[in-house]
Amino acid sequence: MADDKKTNDYTVEMDKLDQGSKNFEAPLPPVQPRSAPNAQLANNPILPVLAYCGSSIMMTVMNKYVLSGTDFNLNFLLLCVQSIVCIVAIQTCKASKLITYRDFNADEAKKWFPITLLLIGMIYTGSKALQFLSIPVYTIFKNLTIILIAYGEVLWFGGSVTGLTLFSFGLMVLSSIIAAWADIKHAVESSGDATAKVSTLNAGYIWMLINCLCTSSYVLGMRKRIKLTNFKDFDTMFYNNLLSIPVLLVLTFLMEDWSSANITRNFPPADRNGIMFAMILSGLSSVFISYTSAWCVRVTSSTTYSMVGALNKLPIAVSGLIFFDAPVTFPSVSAIVVGFVSGIVYAVAKIKQNAKPKTGVLPTSNPVSASSQSMRDSLRS
């Protein structure tokens, strides 16, 4: 029957031809649809993984470049610029129909505002810690936040911690101890004022501790609040950045020095354009992280995304050794390796826990929204 149909498609009925014409056109064979090259490229799993890793590295390096300037002290201004850039970027993407999120609603904003305050505390303390610590040490210490979140889940949401997860936590603590010891050892043995260097490191560790507490509070609070609002990927990013702008503006004008001398010190004429470009690029990179993380989950899987997040710590830490003067010593490299292994073990523990029937779930066991993940990635990187 199928063969008859094929034959009929190409049969010319002679009695229906115009007798005065010697030419006729037979029906063309059906054209087989071909996938567009752009679609094939967009569904290539390697591309979103590389884009996600590159965005995370760019965010951390740009922030460190701005914050490592001589006596930079306008952290609230930096965060405000990043939020404004982010809002402009996602509004442009929404107008271009690249992404979608719900329109502003005053009632939803009121419910979400406490989470925004926790976010401001998280990103501000993260910027202060990154200002005093090297990128590798900062990346290693951010792992401790995972422990706080996990046990917060156990206390407030009925989560559970497996033996393999506990082992990864032990590796995280060990890597942090090695990193701190390597940092202090290098400060004492290097030339210059060792006391001042150790004092700077101690300030960084204090800010890092506060940041871990703020980050875990933000993540746990967001999980509870998101049930009331049912926010999705870019809804969270939109409200977080929009609501933080007025708060950051008030904080920068009230608490930071806006004298002409301090502005010149923070933005020296020789580096002014580079610093401003880095501030804008760091704001854009948060959008890139959010978009590429959602892309990565869509094209690959949440399991692959978890492993990419764990493996991503290594290139981020190495970027600090390449682009900045982070000490390259055996203890510092050992701390990076142990921290890297702890991330892999934790990712494997999450995957195994997801494969079992769930009586309780760790905070990052289920796929989280891309915007929430990007916020954590950008500041734990």
Curated annotation (Swiss-Prot):
Localization terms from the record: Golgi apparatus membrane; Cytoplasmic vesicle membrane; Endoplasmic reticulum membrane
Chain positions carrying an annotated carbohydrate: 262
Keywords: Cytoplasmic vesicle, Endoplasmic reticulum, Glycoprotein, Golgi apparatus, Membrane, Sugar transport, Transmembrane, Transmembrane helix, Transport
Pfam family, one: UAA
Cytoplasmic face of the membrane: 1-40, 93-110, 152-160, 222-233, 296-303, 349-381
Spans within the Lumenal topological domain: 62-71, 128-134, 183-200, 255-274, 325-327
Gene Ontology molecular function, alphabetical: GDP-mannose transmembrane transporter activity
Region (Disordered): 362-381
Family: Belongs to the TPT transporter family. SLC35D subfamily.
Function: Involved in the import of GDP-mannose from the cytoplasm into the Golgi lumen.
Assembly and binders: Homooligomer.
Descriptive protein name: GDP-mannose transporter
Organism of this sequence: Aspergillus clavatus (strain ATCC 1007 / CBS 513.65 / DSM 816 / NCTC 3887 / NRRL 1 / QM 1276 / 107)
